[in-house]
Structures are given as C-alpha cells and as structure tokens.
A protein has these predicted regions:
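The conserved acidic donor/metal-binding loop of glycosyltransferases
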Residues: 93-97
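Short aromatic/hydrophobic "clamp" motif used to bind/position activated sugar donors
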Residues: 89
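Acidic donor-binding loop at a coil-to-helix junction in glycosyltransferase catalytic cores
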Residues: 178-185
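Short, well-formed alpha-helical segments that are part of the catalytic scaffolds
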Residues: 3, 21-34
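Catalytic donor-sugar/metal-binding loop of nucleotide-sugar-dependent glycosyltransferases
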Residues: 153, 186-198
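Acceptor/aglycone-binding surface of glycosyltransferases and processive sugar-polymer synthases
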Residues: 69-82, 100-177
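A conserved acidic beta->alpha catalytic loop
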Residues: 47-55
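Cell-envelope/extracellular polymer assembly enzymes that use nucleotide-activated donors
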Residues: 11-13, 42
Length: 198
C-alpha cells in the first residue's frame, strides 16, 4: 500500500499484552509501519501491573495503556478485544519476537481474500527463511476462517500474532466461543481450525 488510492479505509488496533516489557516495548511498537497503509492505526497496551517502565515507555510512543489487575494472557486479550476501537485487530507479543513490518501485508491479505482470521506460525517462517519476499511470507502465514471445521495441527501453538475482524466477536453466537478459542490457545490446547494453507 504505497499509494493513497490503495489505502484501505480501515481502522487497525494493535493489542499488546505486557508485563515487565520495558526492554522491548518501544521496538515492538516501532516495528509496525505507521505510513498510509491503513486509514488509522492505534496501539492498546493491556498491562499486567508491570513494576518497570513498560507503561511509561508505551505512553511516550503514543499508545493507549490500560492497567488490567486480573492475571492471565486470556484475560488481557479479552479485555483488549472488547476495548479495541479498530474494526481490524492485530495481536503480538511485546518482546520483538514477531515481524511487525509484515502487519500491513497481513491486513491486506485479510481484506483482499475476505478472511475473518489469520494466525501466524513463527516456526514455519524460520524453516522457510531462505525463501524470498512475499512468496516465503505467504508460505509462513496460516490463514484461518472463523469457522471451526476440523482438527488441524498448529505448528506454533504459542503464537501470539493474530489478525482478525473485530466483528466476529460482536456476533452473539460467536463471541463466547471465539473468546474461548483464543484463551485456550494460550493455554496450549489444540484448537479446531480450517486452514487455507496445508
């Protein structure tokens, strides 16, 4: 998305759960391009009562910070998803373990292919590191629909990088079930997904 004519009119919110991430929070936020690849992007930090400078540094980078006193990744994400103002939500760990520079490509893929949910596999990406450009990246991304169709083995069960439409949580029939899926993933459970890549 180099031209304004190509810029999708979408609002993207990046939700980052944090606890004692002062060493990496700034680099994590800055790793995501702030150019004209979307109409608006903002950052929501859901902090688990860090005692270091995580919240201070995030606020200096322009992020919105919410202190979540209840413990757990699942709780942090549930809070973040409900508070996120964007119609597209991106999740990442705040420790620079994910390629923030690829977020525009992920959002583009979500929109262009009319997907509901994308999850990313760090291990597969590492194995295919010799593949150039978007070809290698395309093989790294495991694109998912929001429908739960059959058991699928996720290579990176602890992946925290997701891109999805917030609307899937606004459907009363889906909300509780999909929250349970997200929380279960972070509890290292096997999840039922349909994959567009095999």
């Amino acid at each position: 998305y180099k031209n304004t004519s190509d810029t999708p009119r979408v609002h993207v919110t990046v939700v980052l759960p944090t606890r004692h991430e002062e060493a990496a929070i700034v680099d994590t936020i800055r790793s995501i391009p702030k150019g004209n690849w979307c109409e608006k992007i903002d950052f929501l930090i859901v902090d688990g009562n860090s005692t270091d400078r995580t919240r201070e540094l995030a606020e200096k980078e322009g992020a919105n910070v919410y202190l979540e006193p209840r413990k757990g990744y699942g709780r942090a994400y549930k809070t973040g998803f409900s508070m996120a103002p964007g119609e597209i939500i991106v999740t990442m760990d705040a420790d620079c373990t994910y390629p923030g520079e690829e977020v525009p490509n992920l959002v583009k893929k979500l929109i262009d292919e009319d997907l509901k949910w994308i999850t990313c596999d760090r291990l597969k990406r590492a194995e295919e590191g010799s593949m150039p450009g978007l070809h290698g990246f395309g093989n790294w991304v495991l694109s998912k629909t929001a429908s739960i169709l059959y058991w699928y083995g996720i290579h990176d069960s602890q992946s925290g990088m997701w891109v999805f439409r917030k609307s899937i949580f606004e459907d009363e029939d889906n909300a509780d079930h999909l929250f349970a899926i997200k929380i279960a993933l972070f509890e290292l459970e096997k999840i039922k997904f349909k994959s567009l890549y095999n």
